[in-house]
UniProtKB/Swiss-Prot annotation:
An example Gene Ontology CC term for this record: periplasmic space
Protein name according to UniProt: Tol-Pal system protein TolB
TM region positions: none
Classification via InterPro entries: 6-blade_b-propeller_TolB-like (IPR011042), PD40 (IPR011659), Tol-Pal_TolB (IPR014167), TolB_N (IPR007195)
Described function: Part of the Tol-Pal system, which plays a role in outer membrane invagination during cell division and is important for maintaining outer membrane integrity. TolB occupies a key intermediary position in the Tol-Pal system because it communicates directly with both membrane-embedded components, Pal in the outer membrane and TolA in the inner membrane.
Matching Pfam families: PD40 (PF07676), TolB_N (PF04052)
Signal peptide: 1-21
Assembly and interaction partners: The Tol-Pal system is composed of five core proteins: the inner membrane proteins TolA, TolQ and TolR, the periplasmic protein TolB and the outer membrane protein Pal. They form a network linking the inner and outer membranes and the peptidoglycan layer.
Annotated compartments: Periplasm
Native organism: Shigella dysenteriae serotype 1 (strain Sd197)
Keywords associated with the record: Cell cycle, Cell division, Periplasm, Signal
Domain of life: Bacteria
Length: 430
């Protein structure tokens, strides 16, 4: 917890520009298919009202994962304040085999102790499956809540939780001197802040694997340029500003390289920069357009979009040489892939029959599953644990962000109130 807090502390310098017009998750479908679980309101041991609804945040996290269906508070059979007070039979009668209880205690120095216990109410009734406690200041109460959610999620699923992650995205606001804003928020839309404002378009944010930097495209110089911005101090490093197009940045998983697309010789082609030396080498060539690189876990291979067969399809290439290999065959066209951190599957924009949706492809079998049902879906980005995808779609006259689970069962929206939202990018674990 302490190490994670140190990583997150780097964002505090930007929180002076936290916005009130935040995105919030609105669930559309799929919760009923999740595993039932009980999350009891955390017991508050101080005067007045609790400073944060920790239990509510944990319940929302588990619900937002698409894998759990927390029991509504009005239906809770009891509200125990500790593991010892849990009556397993009352919960198992409702089909619930695990319950989260917790306590929040104020300290004289203004900090808070947050504790939780995950209690088995099924197989081994009354057994504490997981527990932890954290001492945090008020501004870190949501972070402590997400930490508890991560631990509960991992204990019950075997999958590392991703509730302490963030998302970056571009908002085109409704006028003003700087209508384009690169923003970052918690994964659930809270604690939104502005990373960069611009009078010209901003595009394609990409996270460094340690979560400390964002690469993105800016047009502030009158033409496209690739830059890397350090979030802790705002320092900006220009990476590429060649004639014509500079775009689609992607950090390698080992953090040593940045892949991107340039059209300085005519057609779009892929290039890779060694970030330590600044040396750039070309990966693809020819007359076709090659763009939208995404890395495989080995930091040696890229999936990318190419129109070399006529329509856009996804190909794989080794950055050290060799011919690209086509890896998508279903649908009229496929593009803008994002490979999972374990290299087992990818998500992409797949078009067929006039529809453009987010699809998942198994990289071993080639099997494809359409995940989304929204309109003109684009720019999918995977959560670091591979369980969820965030993407943008058209709604009315604008663009909004959407979430879908990688099994396709859970769908939600993150509507913004002050502009169109595009180019979402899910952070690594923070």
């Amino acid at each position: 917890m302490k190490q994670a807090l140190r990583v997150a502390f780097g964002f505090l310098i930007l929180w002076a520009s936290v916005l009130h017009a935040e995105v919030r998750i609105v669930i559309d479908s799929g919760v009923d298919s999740g595993r039932p679980i009980g999350v009891v309101p955390f017991q508050w041991a101080g005067p007045g009202a609790a400073p944060e609804d920790i239990g509510g945040i944990v319940a929302a996290d588990l619900r937002n994962s698409g894998k759990f269906n927390p029991l509504d508070r009005a239906r809770l059979p009891q509200q125990p304040g500790s593991a010892q007070e849990v009556q397993p039979a009352a919960w198992s009668a409702l089909g619930i085999d695990a319950v989260v209880v917790g306590q929040v205690t104020p300290n004289p120095d203004g900090s808070y102790n947050v504790a939780y216990q995950l209690v088995d109410t099924g197989g081994a009734p009354g057994t504490v499956l997981a527990q932890n406690s954290y001492k945090v200041n008020k501004q870190w109460l949501r972070y402590a809540s997400h930490t508890a959610s991560d631990e509960v999620f991992e204990k019950l699923t075997g999958i590392k939780g991703a509730f302490r992650t963030r998302i970056a995205y571009v908002v085109q606001t409704n006028g003003g001197q700087f209508p384009y804003e690169l923003r970052v928020s918690d994964y659930d839309g809270y604690n939104q802040f502005v990373v960069h404002r611009s009078p010209q378009p901003l595009m394609s944010p990409a996270w460094s694997p340690d979560g400390s930097k964002l690469a993105y495209v800016t047009f502030e110089s009158g033409r496209s340029a690739l830059v890397i911005q350090t979030l802790a101090n705002g320092a900006v490093r220009q990476v590429a500003s060649f004639p014509r197009h500079n775009g689609a940045p992607a950090f390698s998983p080992d953090g040593s390289k940045l892949a991107f697309a340039l059209s300085k010789t005519g057609s779009l082609n892929l290039y890779v920069m060694d970030l330590a030396s600044g040396q750039i080498r070309q990966v693809t060539d020819g007359r076709s357009n090659n763009t939208e690189p995404t890395w495989f876990p080995d930091s040696q291979n890229l999936a990318f979009t190419s129109d070399q067969a006529g329509r856009p399809q996804v190909y794989k290439v080794n950055i050290n040489g060799g011919a690209p290999q086509r890896i998508t065959w279903e649908g009229s066209q496929n593009q803008d892939a994002d490979v999972s951190s374990d290299g087992k599957f990818m998500v992409m924009v797949s078009s067929n029959g006039g529809q453009q949706h987010i699809a998942k492809q198994d990289l071993a079998t080639g099997g494809v599953q359409v995940l989304s049902s929204t309109f003109l879906d684009e720019t999918p980005s995977l959560a670091p644990n591979g369980t969820m995808v965030i993407y943008s779609s058209s709604q009315g006259m604008g663009s909004v962000l959407n979430l879908v689970s990688t099994d396709g069962r859970f769908k939600a929206r993150l509507p913004a109130t002050d502009g169109q939202v595009k180019f979402p990018a899910w952070s690594p674990y923070l």
